[in-house]
C-alpha cells in the first residue's frame, strides 16, 4: 500500500457544462487552455457548450468548423452540445444533420442568453424541436427560465450578489413545462423539488 498523503485518488471526472470558446473567442477560453485545466483538476471528459464560440454551433457547417478548430489542441476527451435556437428549431433537416454529426444533445435558452447570435427559444420552438430530438433519442438541455414581471431596485448596488439574485427570482424556475430534459443551473431548492414531482401539471 502506498500513502499518497493529502492527494485524492479517484476515477476521472466528467464535466458536461464547459465553454471552450473556439473558434472566435479564444481570449475567453480555448481548447488548449480549457482541456489542460480540466486535466490538471482530474477531469478527463468535458462536454462543450454551443455558444460563446463564434459562430455558435447550430448547424452541421458550424459544428465542422468547431471540430477543425479543436485539432491538435485536446488534452482530455471532448464531446459537444449543439445549439437549439428559433432559426433551426423548425428545420428538421438542419437538426438531423447536426445530430448525425455527433453532438450529444441540444442546448437552448428560454431567457436571453447574453450572446447576440444565440437567441432564446419559445414554446413553439421547443415543441417543434422535441419531435426531432425524440426521433434521435438525444436530450434537450435547457435554461428553463420563464421571465415574468420583476420589479428591480434601480438603486441596488450592481456589485452585490443579492442584486444579481433579484434578477433571477424563484418563480421563474417554478413556472415550468417539463419534458425529458436537463434543466440547468437551479438555484431555488423548491424549484428542484417541484421539477421532480410527476403530476398532471408537469
Describe every region a protein language model picked out.
Residues 4-5, 9, 43-44, 73-77, ...:
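Short coil/turn connectors at secondary-structure junctions
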Residues 4-73:
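Metal-associated gating/positioning segment near the N- to mid-region
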Residues 10, 59-77, 125-142:
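Alpha-helix-loop-beta-strand connector modules within alpha/beta enzyme cores
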Residues 12-18, 46-48, 78-82, 104-108, ...:
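Hydrophobic faces of well-ordered beta-strands that scaffold small-molecule active sites
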Residues 16-29, 52, 57, 76-90, ...:
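Active-site mouth loops of central-metabolism enzymes
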Residues 49-75, 84-88, 94-97, 108-115, ...:
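Active-site loop-to-helix "anion-binding N-cap" substructures in soluble metabolic enzymes
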Residues 90-202:
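Histidine/acidic residue-rich metal-binding segments in metalloenzymes
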Amino acid at each position: 500500500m502506498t500513502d499518497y498523503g493529502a492527494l485524492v485518488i479517484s476515477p476521472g471526472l466528467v464535466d458536461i457544462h464547459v465553454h471552450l470558446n473556439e473558434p472566435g473567442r479564444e481570449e475567453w477560453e480555448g481548447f488548449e487552455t480549457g482541456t489542460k485545466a480540466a486535466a490538471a483538476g482530474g477531469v478527463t471528459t468535458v462536454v462543450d457548450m454551443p455558444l460563446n464560440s463564434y459562430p455558435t454551433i447550430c448547424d452541421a457547417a458550424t459544428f465542422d468548423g468547431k471540430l477543425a478548430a479543436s485539432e491538435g489542441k485536446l488534452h482530455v476527451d471532448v464531446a459537444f452540445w449543439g445549439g437549439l435556437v428559433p432559426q433551426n428549431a423548425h428545420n428538421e433537416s438542419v437538426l438531423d444533420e447536426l445530430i448525425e454529426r455527433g453532438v450529444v444533445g441540444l442546448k437552448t435558452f428560454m431567457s436571453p442568453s447574453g450572446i447576440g447570435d444565440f437567441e432564446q427559444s419559445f414554446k413553439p420552438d421547443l415543441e417543434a424541436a422535441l419531435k426531432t430530438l425524440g426521433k434521435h433519442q438525444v436530450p434537450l438541455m435547457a435554461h428553463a427560465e420563464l421571465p415574468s414581471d420583476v420589479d428591480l431596485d434601480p438603486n441596488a448596488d450592481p456589485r452585490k450578489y443579492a442584486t444579481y439574485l433579484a434578477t433571477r427570482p424563484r418563480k421563474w424556475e417554478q413556472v415550468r413545462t417539463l419534458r425529458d430534459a436537463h434543466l440547468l443551473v437551479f438555484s431555488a431548492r423548491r424549484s428542484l423539488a417541484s421539477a421532480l414531482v410527476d403530476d398532471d401539471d408537469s
